[in-house]
Amino acid sequence: MSLKLTLNFTELGKGDAMIAGGKGASLGEMTQAGIPVPPGFVVLFIIFDEFIKEADLVQEIDNIIDNVNHKDINSVEVASEKIQALIKNAKMPERIAKEINEKFKDLGTEFVAVRSSATAEDGADNAWAGQLDSFLNTKEANLLEKVQHCWASLFTPRAIFYRFEKGLHTTKISVAVVVQKMVNSEISGIAFSVHPVTEDRNQMIIEAGFGF
């Protein structure tokens, strides 16, 4: 049986965070519970791992991270720029590109949201919410590019700082990508049951705005 590279929301649940990231697993859990969720699929983290291996980037990325001085903003920014360029400029393997494009066609929509979903996201000790990039109103023509940009956002300056702040710089962190049908929402928002900055467990934060 061939290894699955993508899974629909209907195939995922809260126990799948290690393959679909926190966001992907949560969307699957809500879909399974019958909550109205715009349909979509998750490009599993294994694809990112396979992508950087096939592009021969693993050692190069590790070497750059190992030599970062996280207390020097210039050092972090230079490292971030180098790693992101490596990921964005590498060629996506044909079989991976084909599966992602086929899944997109199955959604039957013109526009999708392409959203990063870290495998360490929404954990008890670390919340990666807001650390990685997402792209709205993405069309088929630039879908693969935006997927690679989501992968690259694992190494933005803020994400690198966050790694060191949480002591995760030596921990393997991967990233899945959510591809979800766009909707014309009137209001959208996010809620944190623990304050994401102060980590105060007695304070809940809800942020909302018009549109998406």
Regions found by a protein language model. Name each.
Residues 207-212:
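Short, His- and charge-rich active-site/binding loops that engage polyanionic ligands
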Residues 203-205:
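Structured C-terminal cap/extension of enzyme domains
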Residues 185-192:
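Phosphate/diphosphate-binding loops
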Residues 1-178, 187:
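N-terminal beta-alpha lobe that positions the nucleotide/phosphoryl donor
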Residues 195-196:
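Short, acidic, Ser/Thr-enriched surface-loop or helix-capping motifs
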